[in-house]
From Swiss-Prot:
It comes from Methanococcus aeolicus (strain ATCC BAA-1280 / DSM 17508 / OCM 812 / Nankai-3). This is dCTP deaminase, dUMP-forming. Homotrimer. The gene is dcd. Bifunctional enzyme that catalyzes both the deamination of dCTP to dUTP and the hydrolysis of dUTP to dUMP without releasing the toxic dUTP intermediate. It catalyses: dCTP + 2 H2O = dUMP + NH4(+) + diphosphate. The lineage of its organism: Archaea, Methanobacteriati, Methanobacteriota, Methanomada group, Methanococci. It comes from the Archaea.
Length: 201
């Protein structure tokens, strides 16, 4: 059962569902808008070897970041040009990981799905790739997988970037995500790189 605006507010008021910070104006008919945080990760490896821990740079922004498509020609001169002209803190090319401002805590009978806002889709900016599902019992900030496909896009800290859609399960999960053995991302309060190298093969 998908939660409506009334259901979301009731769950927040009862303490079953936690969104911190919570803004009542971000509640949609059956969704909740979440915002872009200030922490990001860019991978530095030549190849993604998924049996090994991936090298990466983690950084914060004060205000804004420019995301350029992978095929975009970008050198130091162009980066400085963009910074000076548009006042962005950082210019990156290719995919990067971001995080939400909000810390979300789901009870064992509510799961969620992340969707990018349609306004971003209309400028060919995708904020998640395959990781839109959030299991019941999860708590933490939501990691975003951000890619620009057409022109460079400027993103701003605290900008509404996506939405969470909540569903109620028929019965509570016996073991929620954060209590499940082998869960990798429970309780995360920051952007985290892939931990797929910890999988048993």
């Amino acid at each position: 059962m998908m939660l409506s605006d009334n259901d979301i507010i009731k769950e927040i008021d009862s303490g079953g569902l936690v969104i911190e910070p919570f803004n009542k104006e971000f509640v949609g008919p059956c969704s909740y808008d979440i915002t872009l945080g200030d922490e990001f990760i860019v991978y530095t490896d030549e190849v993604y070897d998924l049996k090994k821990e991936l090298n990466h740079n983690k950084f914060k922004i004060e205000n804004s970041i420019m995301v350029c498509p992978l095929c975009y020609e970008l050198d130091d001169e162009k980066i400085e040009y963009f910074k000076n002209k548009y006042g962005v803190d950082v210019v990156v090319k290719g995919g990067l990981l971001g995080t939400t401002t909000e810390f979300v805590e789901l009870p064992n009978d509510i799961c969620a799905q992340y969707q990018g806002r349609s306004s971003f889709g209309r400028v060919f900016l995708q904020s998640h790739q395959t990781a839109g599902w959030i299991d019941a019992g999860f708590k933490g900030k939501i990691t975003l997988e951000i890619v620009a496909y057409d022109k460079p896009v400027i993103l701003y800290k605290n900008q509404r970037i996506g939405q969470l859609i909540f569903s109620k399960t028929l019965t509570p999960a016996n073991i929620g995500y954060c209590d499940r053995k082998g869960s990798k991302y429970g309780g995360q309060n920051s952007v985290n790189a892939s931990l797929i190298h910890k999988d048993e093969i």
